Amino acid sequence: MELIYEGVDITKDVRIVSAVCRDASGGKSDSLELVLGDAEKWYSWKPQQDDKILMRREGYSTGTMYLSAVQPEEGEFRILATAQPMAARRKANKSYEDMTLETIMGLCAAECGMRWRLHGIDGGIRYRYLLRTEESCAALLDRLAGMEGAVLKCWDGQLTMIGIAKQQEAAAVETIRVTARQPGAVHTDRARERLRQLTVATPWVQVSARDAGGSGELSETQTPPATDAATAGRWARGLLLCRNRQAEKLTVHSRFRAEWTAMLRADVTGGTAADGKWLMDEVEHDFMAGTSRVTLVRCIDTIG
């Protein structure tokens, strides 16, 4: 296990009491929570917000994290670092007129000093007009991702927008066996909470998307700034996918699994109702305990 602070390996210079990394997607920033002993040493380094820190274990890396908060606790320090620097969370008022998604990604990345990437989503999507009101770069991109049926992931100084449908079609990189009496495995299926229909309604257009896999009759109307039917239809499908994929979840505990990270495709086997195709939604790695916990969401292909 290695702890790197501002490019220097300080593993031997501190006493690590606990270290938990939360690897997330969908608007949640990856985070690293540390408790370090020997507080006097930490003071001597004069830590500042946005100092860079990362941890590695057995091939897994948190990627570069940015120091967010330091809280002294009886001779120890509780330290929180996130994958977003302060600039990515700074709110602003801006407008974006006749710009493509890749242009907006580039502008936001430059504003907060990060790199950017699109995966499984068309960077040529053009927006006639977008308004950003008291919204951070990360919040704006997360809002766009939700409308486009994508998630925003921040890792190692990079903003990445990942198309959910494309990722669901990818080959599984992990097979997880879950049995009926497996300790720590929790399968939650709230199928009745899936929307049957989501409508995008604006003064200019109204278009609905439907989920053929929903068992209830719930519907919802949202009002994003669509001005044409093509955009409204795409957003209705994207919003419905992002909403309904959260209805069925599976949580699994394991020994430390360096290969587990958010948005990877996994197949679940074991002869239970959880069998099938899933996407990793959030992973928690406990470096000191040597354990990992993954929360997965079921892949759905019934939106139209």
Description of each model-found segment:
Residues M1-A88, K249:
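Assembly/oligomerization scaffold segments
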Residues L34, D38, P47-K52, E76, ...:
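A structural signal for the main folded, soluble domain(s) of proteins
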Residues L34, N93-R117, R132-D156, M263:
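Amphipathic, non-transmembrane alpha-helical segments in extracytoplasmic/periplasmic proteins
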Residues S44-M55, R89-M99, R177, L264-T269:
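Extended Gly/Ser/Thr-rich low-complexity repeat segments
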Residues V70-A83, K91, D286-C299:
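Short, solvent-exposed secondary-structure boundary/capping segments
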Residues E76, A83-Q84, L118-R192:
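Short beta-strand-centered interaction patches in the first periplasmic/extracellular domains
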